[in-house]
Regions:
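Conserved N-terminal beta-strand and adjoining loop/helix that marks the start
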Residues: 1-20, 88-91
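Small-residue-enriched segments and motifs
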Residues: 10, 62-65
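Residue-level recognition of beta-strand microenvironments
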Residues: 67-70
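Unchanged
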Residues: 40-63, 74-125
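Residue-level preference for beta-strand/loop junctions
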Residues: 6, 31, 82-86
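Nudix hydrolase/Nudix homology domain
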Residues: 30-33, 104-153
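Conserved Nudix-box catalytic region and its N-terminal flanking loop in Nudix hydrolases
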Residues: 16-56
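Generic structural signal for beta-strand residues in well-ordered domains
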Residues: 5, 13, 26, 99-102
Length: 153
């Protein structure tokens, strides 16, 4: 059954002591690096969702700093479940660096230095997020939007 409406989700690019957290999830094909995140629940703001999802998936308490990027994925072949997603991607600050993965959602993590993260093997949506972060980190604080990339019509 095809869903009738897009699925709003959040992603967290988590920073702590000038290092950025990336994770691997079995939900993403090709086992590339991505960011923790998930669905926004009914009655929950995007900021509340990112705090909850970061805690559930990584064990980290985070503070949302900025909404960096909004992007859409329509039936992407990179994700295990082809749907229409709206990604609200936040930069978040971790209160500590003691990661405890939810192994049902994630199977690996790594703290990357800011300089090396742009060379990491990431899926395409995280690549867009890292570009938005680089702009933000260089002083350009505008919100970016990446239009639909559809695999099917």
């Amino acid at each position: 059954m095809v869903q009738k409406f897009p699925e709003p989700t959040v992603g967290a690019l988590i920073i702590n002591k000038d290092k950025l957290l990336l994770v691997k999830s079995p939900k993403w094909k090709y086992q590339k690096w991505t960011v923790p995140g998930g669905h926004i629940e009914v009655g929950e703001s995007a900021e509340q969702a990112i705090v909850r999802e970061a805690k559930e998936e990584t064990g980290l308490d985070v503070i949302p700093i900025k909404l960096l990027l909004v992007q859409e994925a329509v039936f992407s072949e990179e994700y295990y479940k082809p749907m229409h997603y709206l990604f609200f991607d936040f930069l978040c600050k971790a209160k500590n660096d003691n990661v405890k993965l939810d192994n049902r959602e994630l199977n690996e993590y790594r703290w990357f230095d800011k300089k090396e993260i742009h060379n990491a093997d990431v899926e395409s949506y995280t690549k867009n997020l890292l570009k938005a972060y680089k702009e933000y980190d260089s002083g350009n604080s505008s919100l970016l939007y990446i239009p639909v990339r559809s695999q099917k019509t």
